[in-house]
């Protein structure tokens, strides 16, 4: 009877926690001016929007094949459809994590929900069209299957991780360790099924049997060196822990390492393993640590287009929540009633109070102003308004001038197909301009919207390079009130 009462109370607390998360995320949707992830979010939307017309996009490794496929039914609703997808993915991750915690016997399994859903980075990126929230859902589903001892199903699902995000290869390697410990080689081979399927599909469609390597955008970046992604300190992500996991989850994650080491030493004396500690030792920590070390090294070495983006850690946010929950569990099994009550209330309050500043959002009661999106949105809009007001894209002599830029958001706003054939194209990205002397093939009358951030970094097309082409007349300049990096200039190609 007592066990049923505990289960019922945990279920009520879980539903209340889910309602809290839904309210927090709905508030964010209402207040946000644009998606987290900026142009990357818009680009993922464009992949899903135009994939029905260009089937090759379903195998594009920048767009991430699994995510594009998942986003297809949501894309007809516009960018809001992908906001809904990521909000749903985040809520499902929270719920499935709770179910996993309950299955593993963690005390107060409902606590996984706020431990995951109120991490600052999760809060900061739920309102987006990025791949990270869906990847987090996929990862927690794998953990749930492993906790349920469905090793073959977990291995097969895990084998598709690299096609939700490229770091899936790192996670797959760590998962292979767990499968080997649990089953030796019996189920380990299942972990290669997804890679084999996509490698063969990609090779058949592209005609390149090295497609999986040659078309990987990060490998191509290393080979082509089109732009400098920057680099920084090895401990860049550790130093940003307040913005990633928040101070409480960070402390609890590190405490879990101590508890795991205590367990390892105790296992030297006792041969009977504890399932929960085995999961922390052989699954959660290897997955979490391998992901952390891989990204830290990539940023430190300035390779594979890292940019030092924090948002990638949304992928392993469920693992941080499991490890934090494991630490709380070890405290709660001491069965000190007053301590357990303080922990439950204190943890929830601490998570709520640190999530908003960590995500760089105001508290709901602090401000009624919208949460701003891309800092350069104002000058970009001024530039687009100028183009439309001056009729620069109006049809002339039976043809419509091209718009050249480096902002996927513009293609989404104008409903331009970035993958259209040359005879139907209305827009090109700025990296399409051939900067070699006499090789610029853009037709006379082409309108160019140059911004000092994406065009300069991603194309890359510096202002001096554009002017050096000698064929583009500057029509307007829109300086940013925030930073010159968000300046926008409008050019017209006056010579063929």
Residue ranges and their predicted role:
Residues 14-18, 107, 111, 192-196, ...:
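Signature aromatic-anchored transmembrane alpha helix within multi-pass, membrane-resident enzymes
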Residues 81-106, 137, 141, 262-265:
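Transmembrane-helix motifs of polytopic, lipid-linked glycan transferases
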Residues 52, 345-411:
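Membrane-embedded, lumen/periplasm-facing catalytic core of multi-pass transferases
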Residues 63, 124-134, 408:
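Short acidic/glycine- and proline-prone juxtamembrane loop motifs at membrane-interface regions
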Residues 24-27, 43, 186-256, 285-296, ...:
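Membrane-lumen/periplasm interface segments of specific transmembrane helices
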Residues 132, 161, 170, 247, ...:
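Hydrophobic/aromatic-rich transmembrane helices and adjacent perimembrane loops
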Residues 94-99, 115, 134-158, 176, ...:
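Specific aromatic-rich, kink-prone transmembrane helix
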Residues 13-15, 94-121, 136-137, 153, ...:
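Transmembrane-helix signature of polytopic, membrane-embedded enzymes
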């Amino acid at each position: 009877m007592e066990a049923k009462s505990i289960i019922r109370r945990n279920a009520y607390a879980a539903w209340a926690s889910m309602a809290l998360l839904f309210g927090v995320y709905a508030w964010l949707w209402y207040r946000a001016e644009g998606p987290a992830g900026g142009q990357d979010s818009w680009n993922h939307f464009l992949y899903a929007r135009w994939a029905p017309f260009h089937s090759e996009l379903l195998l594009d490794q920048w767009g991430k094949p699994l995510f594009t496929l998942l986003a297809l039914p949501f894309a007809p609703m516009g960018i809001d459809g992908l906001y809904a997808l990521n909000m749903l993915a985040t809520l499902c991750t929270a719920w499935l994590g709770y179910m996993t915690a309950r299955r593993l016997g963690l005390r107060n399994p409902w606590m996984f929900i706020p431990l995951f859903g109120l991490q600052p980075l999760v809060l900061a990126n739920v309102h987006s069209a990025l791949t990270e929230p869906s990847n987090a859902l996929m990862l927690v589903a794998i953990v749930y299957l492993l906790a349920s001892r469905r090793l073959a199903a977990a291995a097969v699902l895990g084998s598709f991780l690299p096609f939700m995000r490229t770091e899936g290869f790192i996670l797959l390697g760590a998962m292979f360790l767990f499968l080997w410990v649990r089953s030796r080689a019996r189920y380990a081979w299942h972990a290669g099924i997804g890679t084999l399927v996509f490698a063969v599909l990609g090779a058949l469609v592209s005609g390149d049997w090295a497609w999986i390597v040659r078309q990987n955008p990060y490998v191509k970046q290393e080979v082509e060196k089109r732009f400098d992604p920057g680099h920084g300190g090895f401990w860049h992500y550790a130093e940003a822990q307040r913005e990633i996991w928040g101070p409480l989850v960070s402390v609890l994650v590190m405490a879990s390492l101590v508890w795991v080491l205590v367990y390892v030493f105790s296992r030297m004396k006792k041969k009977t393993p504890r399932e929960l500690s085995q999961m922390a030792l052989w699954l959660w920590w290897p997955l979490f640590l391998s992901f952390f070390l891989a990204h830290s090294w990539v940023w430190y070495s300035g390779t594979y287009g890292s940019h030092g983006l924090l948002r990638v850690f949304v992928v392993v946010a469920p693992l941080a929540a499991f490890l934090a929950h494991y630490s709380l569990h070890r405290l709660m099994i001491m069965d000190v009633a007053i301590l357990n009550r303080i922990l439950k209330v204190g943890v929830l309050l601490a998570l709520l109070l640190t999530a908003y500043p960590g995500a760089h959002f105001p508290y709901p009661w602090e401000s009624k102003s919208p949460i701003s999106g891309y800092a350069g949105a104002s000058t970009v809009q001024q530039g687009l308004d100028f183009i439309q007001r001056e009729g620069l894209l109006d049809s002339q002599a039976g043809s419509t001038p091209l718009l050249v830029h480096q902002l996927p958001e513009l293609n989404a706003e104008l409903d331009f197909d970035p993958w259209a054939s040359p005879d139907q194209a209305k827009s090109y990205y700025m990296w399409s301009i051939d900067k070699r002397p006499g090789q610029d093939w853009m037709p006379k009358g082409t309108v160019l919207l140059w911004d000092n951030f994406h065009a300069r970094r991603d194309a890359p097309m510096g202002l001096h390079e554009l002017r050096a082409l000698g064929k583009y007349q500057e029509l307007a300049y829109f300086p940013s009130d925030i930073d010159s990096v968000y300046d926008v200039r409008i050019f017209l190609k006056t010579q063929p």
